[in-house]
Regions:
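Mid/C-terminal beta-alpha module of Rossmann-like enzyme folds, strongest
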Residues: 15, 21-23, 44-47, 51-92
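Conserved short hydrophobic patches within well-ordered secondary structure
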Residues: 11-15, 19, 44, 116-121
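Amphipathic alpha-helical segments that line or abut small-molecule/effector binding pockets
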Residues: 39-50, 119, 123
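Residue-level detector of conserved, well-ordered beta-strand and adjacent loop positions
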Residues: 28, 62, 103
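NAD(P)-dependent short-chain dehydrogenase/reductase
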Residues: 1-33, 38
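Amphipathic terminal alpha-helices
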Residues: 112-128
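Active-site loop of classical SDR/Rossmann-like NAD(P)-dependent oxidoreductases
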Residues: 10, 67-69, 87-106, 111-117
Length: 128
């Protein structure tokens, strides 16, 4: 979940803070992370609750696309115009989150989880 909490307790703000302040960190080469804007998350949940969809059900609310951690770091480097100080280690795993149930809601709300989504998150939560 990406938002402007001001805390460095999620991977998005941790990487941004580390790159910006030249703090070395480790990148798990095989790991993926799912990043979704808190506003998109809210809109999806709000729509589901207000339309009484999926009553008494467990559903996944996530970005339909998870990002490889090295790709996240590379995208941040490109956005910031600055190299990150990191070591890559052979750890982590890819995981899939089934978001098929919320696809109609995503389409209804016109939320675009396209190739530029990560860039839009960077621009929204870390103005240059």
């Amino acid at each position: 979940l990406v938002g402007s909490s001001g805390k460095h307790s999620n991977i998005f703000t941790f990487f941004l803070n580390s790159i910006t302040h030249n703090i070395p960190f480790k990148v798990w080469a095989n790991a993926t992370r799912n990043l979704i804007d808190v506003d998109d998350f809210y809109d999806i949940v709000h729509n589901i609750l207000n339309s009484n969809m999926y009553l008494n059900s467990i559903i996944n609310i996530a970005n339909p696309r998870s990002y490889a951690v090295p790709y996240i770091v590379e995208s941040m480097e490109n956005y910031l115009g600055k190299r990150a100080l990191y070591d890559t280690i052979d750890k982590g795993a890819d995981f899939d989150i089934d978001t098929a149930q919320i696809q109609p809601v995503i389409e209804k709300l016109n939320i675009s989880f396209d190739d530029a989504y990560l860039y839009r998150l960077l621009k929204k939560y870390h103005e240059l």
